[in-house]
Structures are given as C-alpha cells and as structure tokens.
Amino acid sequence: MVELLGIIRIRGWAKAPWYINETLEMLRLRYNFNTMMYPKTSQILGMLNKVSPYVTWGEIDPDTLKLLIIKRLETAKGDKVSDSYVKEVLKIENIDTMVKQLYEGKIYLHKLDQYFKLPIRLHPPKGGFKGSVKRPYKNKGEFGYRGDKINELMRRMM
C-alpha cells in the first residue's frame, strides 16, 4: 500500500527565489491553493523540504481523497468527475475503486493529465488559516509537514 501525500501551495511567487519557483513548477503547484497528490518517495520529500515555506503537506486519507475527486477534480473538458466518466476513460468501475487503485499504486493521479485538469484548484480555507503562513506548522504556523491534519485543511478548502 502506497502512502499518498497531499500537497497544497499556500504562498505566492513574489520574492521567491528562482529555484523555489522552479521546484514548485516541477510539483505542478503554479498558483496559490493548488493541490496535487504524489506517492511518498525520497525524491518528492526532498523537493518538499526545499520548498517547505511555500507549501504544506501530509498523508491524505481515502475519505478525503474521494471527497476531493468528487467535489474538485475536473475532467479535461471542465466537467465534474462521475462514475460513468471514470468507467469510460480509465476502465475502472467507479470512483471508490479509483481511490483504492491510487492507494495500491496501480495508477498515479499526477500521470493522468490527458483525462483530468491538474493540478486540483481549491478555495481558500473557510475560517481562514489558524496561524501565520510565514511560520512552520509545528510553531503555530501553517507551512511545512502537518501529517494527517492535512485532511482537516483540505476539507475546509473544498
């Protein structure tokens, strides 16, 4: 079973060094409140450590991932994702099995560009951020690694 990381960009590009912007481009996080899902690998973790003042990340659970797919993921044409679309395009029964296959590592969301609009766009969090986006999460801020608390933030941003 693959651990999926949910990564959200929380700061803009102004005054960011070129290597930060370049790494965020590689992660496909071009704008504020964009999110992507990647498997937890040493390469991804290295990139996240490099850009940690601009993103927050953590392990996403299957329920939040399913909700994210249903509410915010769009098809290549801009429509909402449905069971019929997933069955037609990916040859997968429904969204539940798609989530299961994402966690088993059989399919990767970041490699499905031709079927979905990626990255996934989110709203700003309802109620605002609880801390400053200029401080790390462990010091009552918002950026950096936050573990399974990413699910709570994503639900507030859908």
Curated annotation (Swiss-Prot):
SUPFAM superfamilies referenced in this protein's UniProt entry, alphabetically: Ribosomal protein L30p/L7e
Alphabetized UniProt keyword annotations: Ribonucleoprotein, Ribosomal protein
Protein's GO biological process: maturation of LSU-rRNA from tricistronic rRNA transcript (SSU-rRNA, 5.8S rRNA, LSU-rRNA); translation
Gene Ontology terms for molecular function: RNA binding; structural constituent of ribosome
DNA-binding keyword on record: no
Gene3D superfamilies linked: 1.10.15.30, Ribosomal protein L30, ferredoxin-like fold domain
One GO cellular component term noted in the UniProt record for this chain: cytosolic large ribosomal subunit
Keyword set includes Metal-binding: no
Pfam families: Ribosomal_L30
Protein family membership: Belongs to the universal ribosomal protein uL30 family.
Record note on quaternary structure: Part of the 50S ribosomal subunit.
Protein's UniProt name: Large ribosomal subunit protein uL30
Source organism: Saccharolobus islandicus (strain L.S.2.15 / Lassen #1) (Sulfolobus islandicus)
